[in-house]
Amino acid sequence: MRYIGSKKLLLPEIKKMVDKHTDGSEEVFLDLFAGTNVVANYFKQFYTVYSNDMLFFSYVNAKATIENNSKPSFSKLIQAGISSPMTYLQNLEVNDETIGYYEVAYSPTGEANYLSVHNAKKLDIIRSQIESWKNQNLLTEHEYYYLLSSLIEALPFISNTTGTYGAFLKHWDKRSLNDLELQDFTIFDNSKQNKAFNEDANELVQKIKADIVYIDTPYNSRQYASNYHLLENVARNEHPTLKGITKIFDWKNLKSDYATKGKALVAMRDLIQNINSTHIILSYNNEGIISEEDLTNILKEFSVDGIVDIKKIPYRKYQSKNVSKNKEIYELLFYIQRKPFSKNKTLNKPLNNVRVSSTKKYIKSPLNYIGGKYKLLNQILPLFPKNINTFVDIFSGGANVGINVKAKKYIFNDMNTRINEMFRYFQTQPPVKLVQQIEEKIDEWGLSKTNEDAFLAFRKHYNTNPNPLDLYVLSSFSYNYQFRFNNSMEFNNPFGRNRSHFSENMRNNLLNFVTKLQTLDATFTDNYFNEFDFSNLTSNDFIYLDPPYLITTGSYNDGKRGFSDWNNTSEMKLLNFMDYLNQHGIRFALSNVTEHKGKTNQLLKDWAYSRNLNVNYLDHNYNNSSHNSKSKGSQEVLITNYETKTFNLLNTK
């Protein structure tokens, strides 16, 4: 979610400040002004975390992702016959004749353009259903907040605004015409009693204590309640009367003193004075309401040793878009020791028992691999045999398919050794630690979606000393997030300006993928497909093949996806290979296209027909997942040498 003052890009600096002054004995981390819980969620891997915010929609998110430690089971809903609540909510049908509160409030039905009429109707019916389940006692507390936060997180992606809700756009932005899609969360289980609060920060600090307190108050006169009133209204669901063109509720009780000149300094002094903690870290900005000098004086007054550690970070380093270089704008990080303690320094490491879970039906590869089958999984996987002993993905690529298959043993094979080296590295790293390594590398090199010089320097560094971690980081800032190499196996994909970066979605996909991967008995091999040794495979095993497509023009990640070229000769080798599998009674499934942009793969069609194979037609136009390229008029197929209902081998010719 785009959020004013989000500290996502500042996390490495905050972590450095914490590590500099703590000794590893600290247990509780309090985020007093949590917002979207970016900081709280990051530090959950190290500490028991308390999250607080005066806005209720922030509290909802904290209940779902901070206080909650596990993937919701939805056991009562399942008993009631609803196997997947997220899917159920997503598929609820809107009634054109029914006009709900949110439709009148935020759509053209009520003369507002925040949401399309369809999405506002969808919001009404989903919000109502979640509340109904709660009232029927079909949801636990955390299940309720999980579903509600999933809905709230979805709204910015289809809102007709510039990012906040101070006003809506006169003309409809393209993204606002997309359908509302509920957002899944990745949940960290740190086995701690984390807590979420929804209180005034100045009052809360007088009631609780923590070892580390992080403060990120508003800097300027923009009030968060008015800028995010739509999300707050949906979270509270009290249906208040709305006023004015902007359709805002009476938010006076949510007005922050920290965004009010004349009150901010007094409020800050009161806050610091009453905090019961050993360490205080404060984020601010040198153009904020409170001057740097005044902040320093307050902190010095309440520092146990009179010392204030100040770190100035150039503002443009942590922005997604460039700001004028003539502006001397800084993010400020202040640290004071509030109470005395005996420092016995130990390395602050992620908790060993942090676990990751998600409610997503399918795990998505952390790689954007051209030709990936993630969007086809719901059609492909039901056609795969059950009770697979060894699953072999012979053109594994980004491993979207294999990671979602149920089997006893897995072999992922691909010619691209660099990709396989990366996956082998992922197998050895704790998921949370892996993300931390990536974020530290990004910070070390100053990588961002606007800093091309840093990208080029890092690419040169990688090509001099290639390693799997750097390759993944490099791809995260590359054009279309892709992996491309020249004939010397040097990475040569250009910079992905203004788009490519290590996003929250990438982070969650990586965490979920690596967590799942490390539960599998999986091996990664680097063979050409017809050199793969399948002598130990039996009829209880299964081979999936997703080769380059003969009649499409997709340029694969390494130029030719590890192949010098894919032509009729390559296709014949593939068909002969599958004939050999067939003769040895090994079940296989082949993904391919028989038609594409007026072209026909007659070779493949004739081969499948002559062997009496099962051709399953999939409801999907071939799309190579490129941001700038969409193909039409394709027929995607899954060809199997077994019956897809009984999974028995066919009587092939």
Swiss-Prot record:
Root EC class: transferase
The protein's matches in Gene3D superfamilies, at most eight in alphabetical order, are given as:
Adenine-specific Methyltransferase, Domain 2 (1.10.1020.10), Vaccinia Virus protein VP39 (3.40.50.150)
- UniProt keyword list: DNA-binding, Methyltransferase, Repeat, Restriction system, S-adenosyl-L-methionine, Transferase
Its Enzyme Commission number(s) read 2.1.1.72
Q: Which reaction does it catalyse?
A: a 2'-deoxyadenosine in DNA + S-adenosyl-L-methionine = an N(6)-methyl-2'-deoxyadenosine in DNA + S-adenosyl-L-homocysteine + H(+)
Superkingdom of origin organism: Bacteria
Coiled-coil stretches are none
| Protein name, UniProt field | Modification methylase StsI
Please name the source species. Answer: Streptococcus sanguinis
